[in-house]
């Protein structure tokens, strides 16, 4: 009768089963759902709308995978001997993931890496593992690891007491010099001290706040430029040059630096790969500066942004990251 218009069926008024929870509906229709033939990937990050995260989600879906975004702050864990689990706010335990892509802000390193360790113990492949991320985030430790593997860096000084300030300045060749906060990111907390007096003032000011700092030689011949080499699975897949805006020495894109495509030399590519391996990372953005005595590594970034490098090179870096996961998981996509 309803089919020919004689009876009106209003689900909100006439639904005999009453209100049905989403979980019951999901179970009822699960048998009719076409099984997903791709991998199940989790993107562990903070902001789904950032360019890098949107591109990763897009690339995974284009290659036939199911990808879920998990906000780091909304994950919580259960630790026990039999059924350790990671839960997501408002839902059940996160299960059956093949891989996790971590995109971690420095301020969330501690908690996010705790989540990653549990994923790793549950047999989930993490594109960058927790240990590698932790050591790459420690500026002093990462420089020590680089030197241990024979990777060249700018001459760097570190001291605990303000009483050693003068010796620290001499150690790196005097002024001008760079003062870096160990906790700084994206060029923040980096100061160029052009005179010895300015260097003393900056160092002592940071020390009075109990801040940990590094002092580094200033590479004048770099002329406000550096290279970002993007490394995936032991290969430099793209490289760009970053140029600081007028009146600035920092070339970070977040501070107004511009990007352009550049061909890294064989020596620079080798250095970037070596630096990435020293950190134990599969995916990294390696920042290199050209000096009078050869290329030097400034930093190894475990969550490198994609917007600058994809824009400068027109390469699909996000898809390369997904392919690296497929390779590790022995997955061969169909029709892609």
What do the PLM-derived regions correspond to, one by one?
Residues 61, 65-72, 116-189:
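A conserved helix-loop-beta module that forms one wall/lid of the active-site cleft
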Residues 30-36, 263, 277, 290-336:
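C-terminal active-site "lid" helix and adjoining low-complexity regulatory extension at the edge
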Residues 188-279:
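Phosphate-binding site of ATP-dependent enzymes
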Residues 10, 44-46, 232:
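Short hydrophobic segments within beta-strands
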Residues 9, 101-102, 216:
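Redox-cofactor binding/interface segments in oxidoreductases and associated redox assembly factors
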Residues 7, 41-42, 177:
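Conserved hydrophobic helix-helix packing surfaces used for dimerization/oligomerization
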Residues 29-127, 132, 141:
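ATP-binding N-terminal substructure of ATP-dependent carboxylate-amine bond-forming enzymes
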Residues 2-29:
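C-terminal capping/lid region of NAD(P)-dependent oxidoreductase domains
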